[in-house]
């Protein structure tokens, strides 16, 4: 059974600041991925989906669930990742979001040669 463990999350301000201070960036139509290599040996995820970009709470929650689920099932290198939403994301279907995420995970993995 796969679980999204607490250790796989970016929870503290210091964790987010670590990524923001010298992050690499992948930009898609729907998301901005900021990532930076860590020394932990596993990937961690932080989400920043603002009310300004996704107005309805149920849409934000749906998208967070999709992001966490996709992250859980993807074998990623040891990086800290912050995902920022872009306008119009709430109108996308789950299938469309998952397709874009899979392409982006592949791109991110290729940056680290895993």
UniProtKB/Swiss-Prot annotation:
Gene: rnpA
Any matching Pfam family: Ribonuclease_P
GO CC terms of this entry: ribonuclease P complex
Xref: HAMAP family: RNase_P
GO molecular function annotations of the record: 3'-tRNA processing endoribonuclease activity; ribonuclease P activity; tRNA binding
Catalytic activity: Endonucleolytic cleavage of RNA, removing 5'-extranucleotides from tRNA precursor
Keyword Nuclease assigned: yes
Family: Belongs to the RnpA family.
Chain's role: RNaseP catalyzes the removal of the 5'-leader sequence from pre-tRNA to produce the mature 5'-terminus. It can also cleave other RNA substrates such as 4.5S RNA. The protein component plays an auxiliary but essential role in vivo by binding to the 5'-leader sequence and broadening the substrate specificity of the ribozyme.
Name the UniProt record assigns to this protein: Ribonuclease P protein component
Superkingdom assignment: Bacteria
PANTHER family: RIBONUCLEASE P PROTEIN COMPONENT
UniProt EC number: 3.1.26.5
Quaternary structure note: Consists of a catalytic RNA component (M1 or rnpB) and a protein subunit.
Source organism: Legionella pneumophila (strain Lens)
One of the protein's GO biological processes: tRNA 5'-leader removal
Keywords: Endonuclease, Hydrolase, Nuclease, RNA-binding, tRNA processing
């Amino acid at each position: 059974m796969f679980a999204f463990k607490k250790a796989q999350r970016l929870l503290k301000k210091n964790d987010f600041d670590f990524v923001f201070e010298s992050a690499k960036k992948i930009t898609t139509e729907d998301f901005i991925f900021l990532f930076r290599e860590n020394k932990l040996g596993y990937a961690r995820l932080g989400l920043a989906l603002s009310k300004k970009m996704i107005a309805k709470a149920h849409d934000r929650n749906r998208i967070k669930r999709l992001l966490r689920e996709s992250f859980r099932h993807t074998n990623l290198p040891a990086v800290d990742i912050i995902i920022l939403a872009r306008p119009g994301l709430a109108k996308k279907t789950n299938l469309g979001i998952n397709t874009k995420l899979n392409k982006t995970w592949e791109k991110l993995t290729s940056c680290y040669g895993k």
